[in-house]
Regions:
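Histidine/acidic residue-rich metal-binding segments in metalloenzymes
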Residues: 1-76, 80-98
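Glycine-rich, acidic/polar active-site loops that bind/position phosphate-bearing ligands
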Residues: 102-318
Length: 318
């Protein structure tokens, strides 16, 4: 894309300025060429409805132009907005079932990625009348409000501050269960947790699992997972045994909050798929077993000025 188009996108990310259709067409063409070079055949508006997961609908780049010819096409209109059936997604009671129309709209602050053969474009998801039907829309509004309020305060101490960014690092704790054993438990397969059964023969009383040597089979899973994450731009950093038996943790390098949330949503999907390759079932439920620690997702967050000051870092005289 041209330098002017690149600057327009960066201004949209940094300052919330609007992107006109001419620039959107350039961005879409660049995305298409890049994605096709990575083996992509389809694109999707990747969003986070109120289901606790992600959603996507794949459309092919393929588009007929005459009776006997076709091209690979992806326009600015297709990038910026898509229409989706919103009637079958949870909405918190804010709309009627017959109000089916919903819209996904491009979030330029979260980079697109190629997952398999699909170009995934992070988007918000809203109703025809503008209500948020996802988790990203209220997050973006909250980040904007925090930026405005925190910048006003920070400028009392440093007139050079023009923006305050919320950063986030999500600790992803999880249990790994052998697939052969998990499939014998309907409660695990249906609910992702145990609902009946006897206490385990060994718990966490000796604290010998926490930060212990990682079992070789689990380590092979972690290595495979990290490779997949790096290909998708997820900056994984730390891996270790957690407190409970067969409980582990993966932590990324912290980043801008909106992007960190998107990466964590993608991470959980990747973890499930890689677990299948290693004959594991991964459990994310907060309390899958009685009598031992559950899994948390600690949100380590802070506020950072555009002058490089971490506002939550303790001073020499806290």
């Amino acid at each position: 894309m041209t330098r002017d188009a690149f600057d327009a996108v960066m201004n949209a990310i940094e300052y919330g300025t609007k992107i006109d259709r001419r620039v959107a067409d350039q961005v879409a063409a660049s995305m298409r060429d890049w994605a096709i070079s990575k083996g992509a055949t389809h694109y999707t508006h990747w969003f986070q409805p109120l289901t606790g997961g992600t959603a996507e609908k794949h459309d092919a780049f393929f588009e007929p132009v005459t009776r006997d010819s076709a091209i690979e096409r992806f326009s600015g209109n297709q990038l910026v907005q898509q229409e989706s059936d919103a009637s079958s997604f949870p909405n918190g009671g804010i709309r009627n079932t017959f109000e089916a129309r919903g819209y996904t709209a491009w979030d330029p602050s979260s980079p697109p990625f190629v997952y398999g053969t699909v170009l995934c474009i992070p988007t918000i998801f809203i109703a025809y009348t503008g209500e948020a039907l996802d988790n990203k829309t209220p997050l973006l509004k909250a980040l904007s409000a925090i930026d405005q309020a925190a910048t006003e305060v920070a400028r009392y101490f440093d007139k050079n501050v023009s923006k305050v960014t919320c950063t986030l690092g999500c600790e992803q704790e999880y249990f790994l269960i052998d697939r052969t054993l998990a499939t014998t438990r309907p409660d695990l397969m249906i609910t992702g947790r145990t609902l009946l059964g006897h206490e385990a023969a060994k718990g966490q009383q000796l604290d010998d699992h926490y930060l212990g040597a990682i079992p070789s089979r689990v380590l092979a899973y972690m290595r495979d997972l990290e490779q997949e994450c790096l290909l998708l731009g997820i900056p994984v950093k730390t891996r270790h045994n957690e407190v409970a038996p067969n409980q582990f943790e993966l932590a990324p390098i912290f980043g801008e909050a909106n992007l960190a949330v998107d990466q964590n949503s993608l991470l959980m999907d990747v973890m499930r798929k890689v677990a299948e390759r290693h004959d594991f079932v991964v459990l994310f439920h907060e309390k899958p077993f009685a009598g031992v620690n559950g899994s948390g997702k600690h949100n380590n967050w802070s506020l950072v000025t555009d002058t490089g000051v971490n506002l939550f870092a303790p001073s020499k005289t806290p």
